[in-house]
């Protein structure tokens, strides 16, 4: 009886410990990493947004493109087509921001 109680307490302590050590910050800030990147160019007409992955917790820097079909694709930020796509998306997003003020 004493051994089963001890094992039960040990199991509970083991289950609770990682949650306490992780703390509230680990729960509120999930980290997205790219482990593989696409090899082929994605046409800019298929892309609608992007975000950069620069976390020190990730094995590599990357850009995640979101397509018009809401798929996320990891790409190498050093690739020329990736830089061109980012520039294009930046310009089109600025155009959309400025349009309402131009209407008067």
UniProtKB/Swiss-Prot annotation:
Its main location: secreted. The keyword Endoplasmic reticulum does not apply. Induction: By interferon gamma and lipopolysaccharides (LPS). Disulfide bonds join 33-58, 34-74. The keyword Disulfide bond applies. InterPro entries: Chemokine_b/g/d (IPR039809), Chemokine_CC_CS (IPR000827), Chemokine_IL8-like_dom (IPR001811), Interleukin_8-like_sf (IPR036048). Predominantly expressed in the lymph nodes and thymus. Also found in the salivary glands containing lymph nodes, breast, heart, lung, brain, small intestine, kidney and colon. It is found in: Secreted. Keywords: Chemotaxis, Cytokine, Disulfide bond, Inflammatory response, Secreted, Signal. GO terms for molecular function: CCR2 chemokine receptor binding; chemokine activity. GO terms for cellular component: extracellular space. GO terms for biological process: angiogenesis; immune response; inflammatory response; monocyte chemotaxis. Residues 1-22 form the signal peptide. Belongs to the intercrine beta (chemokine CC) family. Chemotactic factor that attracts eosinophils, monocytes, and lymphocytes but not neutrophils. Potent monocyte active chemokine that signals through CCR2. Involved in allergic inflammation and the host response to pathogens and may play a pivotal role during early stages of allergic lung inflammation. Homodimer. This is C-C motif chemokine 12. It comes from Mus musculus. The lineage of its organism: Eukaryota, Metazoa, Chordata, Craniata, Vertebrata. The gene is Ccl12.
